[in-house]
A protein has these predicted regions:
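Alpha-helical transmembrane segments and immediately membrane-proximal extracytoplasmic
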Residues: 1-475, 479-506, 510-511, 565, ...
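ATP/adenylate-binding site constellation spanning eukaryotic-like Ser/Thr protein kinases
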Residues: 205, 426, 473, 516, ...
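The conserved cystathionine-beta-synthase
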Residues: 479-497, 502-504, 523-526, 544-564, ...
Length: 598
């Protein structure tokens, strides 16, 4: 009875809203709420991570190697993996990829548990030293908040997709205090279309989350950065070279990440993954303690250090402590091994994103580039802290294929607006370098291979939004190879189609098709009814469409074969139905009209 009362109360609230608040106004209210809830989620996650890290590492001696680095990461990914397998019982890795999939294939619907599951799993993972970032989990959390808040009020799927974007924008703005970057990330990475009806809700969520973050944690930028030397135009060639270097580092990170995760994917037992990932991660963190956690302390150090004495503290707690002459080699090895630490964290059962690793790698890459040049006098002096800042924008732009996000995020993170021009040069150079080798970002490449990626290309976007099950027609009469012509004629009489799929009677496998035009000249000659069987009359289909094919691939198959109807089969070759051009065009028009409404 109480459930029915709650249900009717919710229905009354929805009806009151529909009668008294216009939808556009209500979307603005929802975007404001999404911004508040997402910022609170970001604050909770950051607090959770810092409490665990401080409790575990506050008593470490900086002059000695700490063997607990061999233990903490394994404990973290074990606890996170156990939580995901036994409590959540769903895959919550690759948060941004899941959001892209929800937008393109699930009409903006994200499972409710993502509101809290990513916070707990990533908090444990990173707090215990997992070498990943908290940003992708909080972006998934924010998007889940937007999606489920919209679902509660029965909003249509276009609005759900917008609220998913609002959650992502609020997450970036809240965790980084970067409202512009939050908006740009949503447009550039999540491919949310920029229209007047979408811009205002995204801005409201982003500004609301950033404001709440300012109120609770102060108005200072996330990283302190003081520009000691203004940017000189004669350094532009070196800035371009840094961008190219960052693009190559991004390519290495992307390719290596996919390769190592592929190795973990082939391990079918979660405890094998834990053992493999745990050993790899703990050994790497023991040798290179800066790989512990998000790595923001290292970024802070390189952005503010001015001498070798300060930079050397990056080797604290390691077996390399005191070897100042090995600093450059030490940092280069971190660039090399960071991707393995991040992959081992996620592959072993942990939960985290690649935002922080991208910033971390970029900062070290920029520092190494300038420090190496200064040590060997390849050029005029290149300020290490300036190039470390620019490197952050370069690697982020390359890994995410998002140059604008890289520029605005780094500027807002550090207050480094005086370096806006070189930030843009580095970001564009890095982006142009990586797209020459890798056309899709680390987030989108998995979906792009399956034809499930929504882009700003309207035609491709509409095809992506279309679903195979909505265009498959199943009112075709099937025939079997052992049937004679007389039985085939009876089947023809009961159908209004001119094509007949031939299937195996026991397995349902598609063997071929019979076209009405091919038998029209003999179908009324009764003396031939027992002479011919379907196996002699059938022909091969021009091509087969698989239920797993994307609509863009389906359209390409139609163009290649010049056919009007094509059979659809599952992965085992069993007949499912037919797809026709006319059905696709009708469905395309319906989706286009709905998709284009502003």
């Amino acid at each position: 009875m109480r459930t029915e009362e709650k249900l009717s109360l919710m229905q009354r609230c929805i009806k009151w809203r529909e009668d008294n608040i216009k939808e556009k106004q209500f979307i603005l209210i929802l975007s404001f709420l999404v911004g508040i809830f997402t910022a609170l989620a970001a604050l909770i996650l950051k607090f959770f991570i810092h409490q665990i890290q401080n409790f575990l590492t506050d008593n470490f001696n900086v002059t000695e190697a700490n063997y607990l680095y061999l233990v903490y990461p394994v404990v973290g990914i074990f606890l996170a993996g156990w939580f995901v397998r036994n409590i959540v019982k769903d895959d919550i890795s690759h948060g941004v990829t899941k959001i892209l999939y929800a937008i393109s294939r699930r009409q903006g619907r994200i499972k409710r548990h993502n509101i809290w599951s990513s916070i707990i799993a990533s908090g444990i993972t990173i707090g215990f030293g997992g070498s990943v970032g908290a940003e992708a989990p909080i972006v998934l959390t924010g998007s889940a908040i937007g999606s489920n808040l919209g679902s509660v009020f029965k909003m249509e799927h276009r609005t759900l997709m917008l609220l998913v974007g609002c959650g992502a924008a609020g997450a970036i703005a809240g965790i980084f205090k970067a409202p512009i970057a939050g908006l740009v990330f949503t447009l550039e990475v999540l491919m949310i279309d920029l229209t007047m009806s979408s811009l205002l809700p995204l801005l409201i969520s982003s500004v609301t989350a950033a404001t709440l973050s300012y109120i609770t944690t102060g108005t200072e930028a996330m990283f302190k950065f003081h520009l000691d030397e203004a940017f000189a135009l004669n350094r532009i060639p070196y800035v371009i070279l840094l961008g190219i270097f960052c693009g190559l580092v991004s390519l290495y990170f992307t390719r290596a990440m996919n390769s190592v995760e592929g190795v973990f994917g082939r391990l079918d037992n979660p405890y094998k993954k834990l053992a493999f990932g745990g050993v790899m991660l703990s050994v790497l963190i023991f040798l290179f303690p800066p790989l512990y956690g998000e790595g923001y302390d290292t970024i802070e150090l390189l952005l503010n250090g001015t001498s070798v004495v300060e930079w050397d503290t990056v080797m604290n707690n390691s077996i390399f402590y005191g070897y100042s002459n090995l600093l450059l080699l030490y940092l280069m090895l971190i660039i090399l091994f960071k991707v393995f630490a991040s992959s081992a964290t996620n592959g072993g059962g942990g939960c985290g994103g690649i935002f922080a690793p991208s910033l971390y790698l970029g900062c070290i890459a920029g520092f190494v580039f300038s420090h190496f040049s200064n040590d060997f006098a390849f050029s005029a002096y290149l300020p290490e802290k300036n190039f470390a800042l620019m490197g952050m924008a370069g690697v982020m732009s390359g890994v995410m294929h998002a140059p604008l996000t890289g520029v605005f995020l780094i500027a807002e993170l550090t207050g480094g607006y005086d370096l806006f021009l070189p930030l843009m040069i580095v970001s564009v150079s890095s982006y142009l370098t990586i797209i020459a080798f890798e056309p899709h970002s680390i987030y989108s490449m998995r979906l792009a291979k399956k034809g499930q990626l929504l882009t700003h290309h309207k035609d491709k976007a509409v095809l992506t939004l279309m679903k195979m099950e909505n265009v498959v027609e199943k009112d075709f009469v099937t025939v079997h190879p052992e049937m004679d012509l007389g039985e085939l004629v009876k089947a023809i009489a009961s159908s209004h189609r001119n094509v007949f799929p031939v299937t195996d009677k026991t397995t349902g496998e598609l063997l071929g098709i019979v076209l009405l035009d091919d038998i029209r000249n003999i179908m009324f000659r009764q003396e031939l009814y027992h002479r011919f069987t379907v196996s002699k009359l059938m022909t091969s289909a021009p091509a087969k469409i698989y239920t797993t094919d994307g609509m863009e691939q389906v359209m390409q198959t139609f163009d290649d074969t010049k056919a009007w109807n094509l059979p659809v089969v599952d992965e085992e070759g069993r007949y499912e139905g037919f797809v026709s051009k006319s059905k696709i065009f009708n469905s395309y028009r319906q989706v286009l009209v709905h998709f284009s409404e502003d």
